Regions:
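Anionic-ligand binding patches
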Residues: 2-7, 13-17, 22, 26-32, ...
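N-terminal G-site helix/loop of the GST-like fold
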Residues: 28-54
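Short glycine-rich, polar/acidic loop-and-turn segments at beta strand-coil junctions
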Residues: 37, 57, 97-99
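Short glycine-rich, Thr/Ser-proximal phosphate-binding strand/loop in the N-terminal lobe
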Residues: 48-65, 142-144
Length: 144
């Protein structure tokens, strides 16, 4: 499974890099996806938006007292800001998604065992999927 993810991520980076080059040569501002997620890249490809990807390295720990909505909004903003800080120009798109069940935020499972435990927790229960999105202009570092 990891090899398939790596293959998809490499293909997405290759395609997005080519699209970004074409966009830049046309004089258009580049869109940068602040994520290594093949799913997010797939969404942008499916809508036909040219982009490039740069992974953001941010602390994804839930802070004490932080509610789930504030959590995904903060992570989206921090990811976009981290990538924008390394760029001179362009629009940087950050996003984060989490699942909340019975008030508990479920992070990324560390391994297969934790993933199975999460699925058991979700079984037969209503849950929410929350996504935060932030757009940062690299030149001004202004967040939208």
């Amino acid at each position: 499974m990891d090899n398939e993810r790596e293959r998809q991520a490499a293909a997405a980076a290759r395609v997005s890099g080519e699209a970004a080059t074409a966009r830049a040569s046309a004089g258009l501002e580049p869109l940068v996806l602040a994520s290594a997620s093949p799913r997010r890249a797939e969404i942008l490809r499916n809508v036909g938006w040219p982009f490039e990807t740069q992974a953001a390295d941010v602390d994804e720990q839930l802070r004490d007292g932080e509610d789930p909505t504030a959590y995904v909004e903060r992570l989206a903003r921090e990811k976009a800001e981290a990538v924008a800080a390394r760029r001179l120009f362009g629009l940087v798109l950050g996003a984060d998604t989490t699942v909340v069940v019975e008030g508990r935020v479920l992070g990324k499972p560390a391994d297969d065992s934790e993933a199975r435990a999460m699925l058991r927790l979700l079984g037969g229960r209503t849950h929410e999927v929350l996504t935060g999105v932030a757009l940062v202009r690299a030149e001004s570092k202004r967040v939208r």
